[in-house]
Every structure is written in structure tokens, then in C-alpha cells.
Amino acid sequence: MNILIISFVDDNFGDNLIRICFESLLKVVLKNHHIKDYTINRMNLKDIDNNLLISSDIIFFAGGGLFGLSYLNFYKYLDKITKIADEYNIPVIFSSMGVNNMDATKETEDKLVDILKRKCIKAVSVRENEDLFRQYSAETSLTIDSVCDPACWSEYVYHFDNISSKRLLGINVVRGG
């Protein structure tokens, strides 16, 4: 099975941490279901590789504010990727998604609604704005459930359980602006 994990990769440590933690959680799920024959590939949201997409058996969006309606224009990439997945009948799962709606317009909101209507979209979980996602998916059969951000599992992914309480570690995972 060829699994593709898509995430936003840039200089924001939080987005990278989301992908790393999501992949770790996915590996636990695969192990718990005794699935051993798989390959995990990764793709940056903004570096679309058509060959990688069409060779995938399933596509996961790792989480974060990818349903962004802001200046980052994530919806344009989600649109292109899910159109390809729809054309090739590749199931897509959105995991622990967020909505960054700083500059939301009717046009961008309509585009997200259209994306969620695609047949390739099989599941959506959200880390925030559950009611807004329910509104966007109202014309679909999708069930929207809340989960924590994958980065919440970083203490287990990085084995922070043995750190002394006298030594603290701080991680900046919030985008400025």
C-alpha cells in the first residue's frame, strides 16, 4: 500500500511538527492493525507531484490550518490535489484540520465547500471550528469529529517522559501575525 502524507512544510516549526507526529501516530495505527506491507511517502502541500499523487493508494492531509482562507491560499492546493484524487479514485482523509479564516471571502468559502463534496473525501476530523466544518460539509454525508492536534503527542513521539521537572523545554509552534 502506498500512503501519501501531505502537509505544509516551511520555516514554521509547528507545521513540521504536525506532520512528524501525524506520521508517528499513523505508524502506530498500522502496527495495531497488523498492516506491514506499506510505504509512506511525503509531499509538501505547495510542491504538488502528480506522479506521487496518482501512484498513491490513499492520501492523508496531516493536519493544521490547511483549510486556510487567508493570504496563504491553501485552498488552491487542496483544490488541485483533491481534483486529481477524485479523477483517479484515490481516497482522501483530512486529519485534525483547522480553518484559518482571517481573510475569508464567499469565493474561498464556496471553494472549500466544493472540495468537501468530492467523492474522494472519505473522512474529516478537525482540531478547531467544528461548527464551521459542519456548515461547510452540510451537503455531504461526512461526519465531522473533533480530535487534538497531532503535535499534542510530541512528548511521546520525542520520548520526553524522562525529562526532569527542573529542566524545561519550550517549543514555539504558533505562527505570528
Predicted region positions:
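Active-site anion-handling motifs in enzyme catalytic cores
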Residues: 1-177
